[in-house]
A protein has these predicted regions:
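Short loop/turn microsegments at loop-to-beta-strand junctions
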Residues: 27-28, 49, 134-136
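Structural micro-motif
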Residues: 105-107, 123-127, 131-138
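Short active-site neighborhood of thiol/selenol oxidoreductases, capturing the structured segment around
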Residues: 41-64
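Structural microenvironment flanking redox-active thiols in thiol-disulfide oxidoreductases
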Residues: 64-104, 114-116
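N-terminal "domain-start" segment that seeds a small globular fold
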Residues: 14-43
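Bacterial N-terminal signal peptides
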Residues: 1-11
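Thiol-/selenol-based redox modules, centered on thioredoxin-like
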Residues: 132-164
């Protein structure tokens, strides 16, 4: 993603269920509901690059800046045959509320049961007894392999896709 994005400030109590998926590994399939309350799975995008980014919380400053950065660069992703999917542990209703205020042409997926974030080994951060997905981005090739894992906001994800 291009641009500087502020990180969400949460308490430092993170854990990952099974260790983060590494570059070179197969991306686990998942099916989650989008902000439109429709199921979306990784296999829906076979043959395309997938930029799967996990973020802590809808409508927070850092997460909004990050989402706007992906939206700003959406034409670059389209030109690279790549789609963007955002995932948080928020509920579909939270995504609907956010999308009623901000316009995103990509899907926001709800993972309130932590199934996808656990499968990918995304650490969960606990803050005031609530859990949030840690910020991570997975660049997945058209054949379903993870080619890059970004554990911080990466300003050159389009460049990563282009180089691969």
């Amino acid at each position: 993603m291009l641009g500087v994005v502020a990180a969400c400030a949460f308490g430092i109590n993170a854990h990952a269920a099974s260790g983060t998926i590494q570059a070179g590994g197969v991306a686990p399939n998942f099916t989650l509901l989008s902000q439109e309350d429709k199921p979306v799975g990784l296999t829906d995008y076979k043959g395309k690059w997938v930029i799967l980014y996990c973020y802590p919380k809808d409508q927070t400053n850092g997460c909004t800046l990050e989402a706007h950065g992906f939206q700003r660069d959406i034409a670059k992703y389209d030109a690279l045959n790549a789609i963007v999917l955002g995932v948080s542990v928020d509920k579909v209703e939270d995504h609907k509320t956010w999308c009623s205020k901000d316009t995103f042409s990509f899907k926001l997926l709800a993972d309130p049961d932590h199934k996808m974030v656990d499968a990918y080994g995304v650490p969960l951060v606990t803050y005031k007894e609530m859990k949030f997905a840690n910020r991570q981005t997975f660049v997945i090739s058209p054949n379903g392999k993870v080619v890059r894992v970004c554990t911080k906001v990466d300003e050159d994800i389009p460049g990563t896709v282009q180089r691969c």
